[in-house]
Amino acid sequence: MTNSIEQAWDLAKQRFAAVGVDVDAALTRLDTLPVSMHCWQGDDVTGFEDPDGVLTGGIQATGNYPGKARNATELRSDLELALALIPGPKRLNLHAIYLESDTPVARNKIEPRHFSHWVTWAKKHQLGLDFNPSCFSHPLSADGFTLSHADPEIRQFWIEHCQASRRVSAYFGEQLGTPSVMNIWIPDGMKDTPIDRLAPRQRLLSALDEVISEKLNPAHHIDAVESKLFGIGAESYTVGSNEFYMGYAASRQTALCLDAGHFHPTEVISDKISSAMLYVPRLLLHVSRPVRWDSDHVVLLDDETQAIASEIIRHNLFDRVHIGLDFFDASINRIAAWVIGTRNMKKALLRALLEPTDMLRQLELRGDYTARLALLEEQKSLPWQAIWEGYCQRNDVPVDARWLDAVREYEQQILSQR
């Protein structure tokens, strides 16, 4: 460490020790908590299946910042820069539309070999991979239905796509030695008030059971399902609601995905974690930032991001919660978006680990809510930034906004040529 950072580090450790926090133990734990970065920030959820295709499914990537990745080589290059600017363990989350093939591949025919380059790259960079079937931006999803479609042939197509995706996910886990979390999200819903809310959900229930019927090694693959309140063009009814997937995950013992933007604007997923964990074996979190709707803005170090991290740490959910990011902002430098959002998630986890939780819990159990509030607020002023800077320097990444210099240089030399 440099002298100034080392001095600040030593003083900060003393401050935290005075309130019973072991900084070294906190950093050891932080190094066991990977954050899964989402590949689709790098190209506005375009993928490689049809680069000229239109994004559908009730989601939008707004903006037209130059330099988005146009192929796998460019996307991996951009990711490598982002990864080099973020301390600690990371993973990469892929969608099925990021396959690589010299010839067109139907989505229900994808195979592990179409993702072999990603596995080779992940091994080189010591990353785990996660996966998602892509049930959007496709002719057979154009009318707004996939796994709950009333047409059995179309429904079967999407069932087969999800089944094939599970095999890809298991391949990732087997090759990389860490389980791949495969999340199923579908856009199915209606713009206006439906007459029959039940039948699509019955079809979805049956379809999901068929999707997960093949037994896969849990050391390689974990199933997750994700709800949503509404999407553009599906404002009145969403088949895969929170109640539907909470019941499904609890009854089938899959993981449940909670996306920060997939609920009513006054709801927060930090308040849902402790309840859900009583009924499901695992949670997948999609940390995002909804602005008035599921806008998928870049994650900030705000109250909700901190609350999400605190719930994980306070309840020792390290082995049951998988932390992923889900945002896509096309109005700013896409590499910077990755770095900002992922560093903020890491900062939130660090701050949660540096909290004197045992002391605060004892005050709560004694009913001393005055002291609980006072100390909870005072601990926010403890010098966690000095620990963060030391952690960054230990991991050979920039300690402050100097990481932006590397992004700007890359933008001038590489992105400007696209």
Swiss-Prot record:
Name its pathway.
Answer: Carbohydrate degradation; L-rhamnose degradation; glycerone phosphate from L-rhamnose: step 1/3
Q: Which domain of life is it from?
A: Bacteria
* NCBIfam families in the record: PRK01076.1, rhaA
- What binding details are noted for the cofactor? Binds 1 Mn(2+) ion per subunit.
Keywords for the protein's UniProt record, in alphabetical order = Cytoplasm, Isomerase, Manganese, Metal-binding, Rhamnose metabolism
Q: What is this protein called?
A: L-rhamnose isomerase
Question: Which organism is this protein's natural source?
Answer: Yersinia pseudotuberculosis serotype I (strain IP32953)
- Which compartments is it annotated to reside in? Cytoplasm
**Task performed by this protein:** Catalyzes the interconversion of L-rhamnose and L-rhamnulose.
Q: Which GO terms describe its biological process?
A: L-lyxose metabolic process; rhamnose catabolic process
**Recorded family membership:** Belongs to the rhamnose isomerase family.
Record's Gene Ontology CC terms? Answer: cytoplasm
What start-end ranges are recorded for coiled-coil regions in this protein? Answer: none
Citing just one GO molecular function, the answer is: manganese ion binding
| Assembly, per entry | Homotetramer.
Q: Key word Protein biosynthesis present in the record? A: no
- Which class of enzymes does this protein belong to? isomerase
Q: What EC designation does it have? A: 5.3.1.14
Which of this chain's residues are annotated to bind Mn(2+)? 262, 294, 296
Q: Which cofactor does it need?
A: Mn(2+)
Q: Which reaction does it catalyse?
A: L-rhamnopyranose = L-rhamnulose
